[in-house]
Amino acid sequence: GLKVSCSVSAHHLTLIDDELDFFDSKVKVTPPLRTKSDTKALLKGLKDGVIDVITSDHNPIDIEHKKLEFSLAKDGTIGLESLFGTVNSVLDIETTIKALTINPRAIFGQESITIEKDTVANLTLFNPEGISVFSKENILSTSKNSAFTGKELKGKVYGIFANKKLVLN
């Protein structure tokens, strides 16, 4: 049979159209945000295994193209830095990890990662129960257009080790 995979962005899992100020261009994304029942269906699809992967849909837009009248502003929001906390706020940790790491590797035919003696491990240190507020001051991306600015997220990242170096602390 034909191999098919399905993904959804973190902001489509967590943001609901009628709860937001739609004249705020930070939430202008493509496809547009939908209803609470749509979001519930997406979450069910993840839990049931119909949806395989959650993406950041990281689409940085410079301030000149976001600080326009809503209809003229470009679509897009950054999503990489808020991804874990956003998703972990609405899903259990097992589903979160599977959709962010295990399933994407499987889809692309990559082996599962294991931690073994005498091998280099790339790790993210996090507390799945930790709470943090996603603030504009802490955004590392050049673009600051996040739909999650000021929101409380569940899951605090303390650091990332890659190729024997601490790359985020």
Where do the protein language model's features map onto the residues?
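Active-site core of metal-dependent hydrolases
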Residues: 1-54, 58-74
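Flexible, active-site-adjacent loop/turn segments at secondary-structure boundaries
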Residues: 11-13, 18, 27, 31, ...
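Low-complexity, flexible helical/coil segments
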Residues: 16-24, 38-47, 88-94, 153-165
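Electropositive phosphate-/nucleotide-binding environments in soluble metabolic enzymes
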Residues: 23, 32-40, 74-81, 94, ...
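His/Asp/Glu-enriched, well-ordered alpha-helical/loop segment
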Residues: 26, 47-48, 53-54, 59-126
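A generic local structural motif
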Residues: 38-42, 111-112, 146
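C-terminal cap of metal-dependent C-N hydrolases
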Residues: 72, 120-169
